[in-house]
Amino acid sequence: RRSGNIKKILDAQQSARHVFFLGDVTGDIEDVIRLYPDKTFHIVSGNCDIFSSYPSSDIANIAGHGIFFTHGHTLGVKYGTERLVSAARAAGCDIALYGHTHASKVLYEDGMYVVNPRSCAEPRDGSKSYAVIDIEENGIMPIIIKI
């Protein structure tokens, strides 16, 4: 179910060069990665990825922007994004991505974009969705897209 939704998203977003998985990928992600060799995958483990070898958070640098990405359960994102933003700033990033709550969020505050795509499999606040973040010379545009 989850990998089918992921394939639909990647087929719809063919121009995407980077793909972020924010945890709870539960094992079927390796098959998806093999199907899209032209994309760069950035993956972190979530609270349901007990045997995962992926880190709980990581950093990517894309087009001059630092992207801190995590599932978020270790940073208490269910209770607010302050610790997430603090960790992203400490890492020199201007974009923070997280999951865990399965509730979408797009926020810009004090030079930091904070984005939660919701979930493509098990949303908690409405429709299944994902996020697209266009990074261009003239700015950053994050949007949530319903499936």
Residue ranges with predicted function:
Residues G64, G111-M112:
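Residue-level detection of beta-strand-connecting loop/turn positions
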Residues Y79-H102, I135, I140:
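Charged, elongated alpha-helical/coil segments that serve as electrostatic interaction surfaces
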Residues D49-A91, A121-R124:
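Active-site-proximal segments of metal-dependent phosphoesterases and phosphodiesterases across multiple
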Residues G4-K7, R89-G92, Y108, V115-I147:
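Binuclear metal-dependent phosphoesterase catalytic core
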Residues R1-I62:
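Core catalytic region of metal-dependent phosphoesterases/phosphodiesterases
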Residues H18-D24, H42-N47, F68-H71, D94-H100, ...:
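Active-site neighborhood of phospho(di)ester-bond hydrolases with catalytic His/Asp-centered motifs
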Residues R1-N5, T26-E30, C48-S53, L75-G80, ...:
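Active-site environment of divalent metal-dependent phosphoester hydrolases
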Residues S57-D58, S104, A131:
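Residue-level detector of beta-strand structural context in well-folded domains
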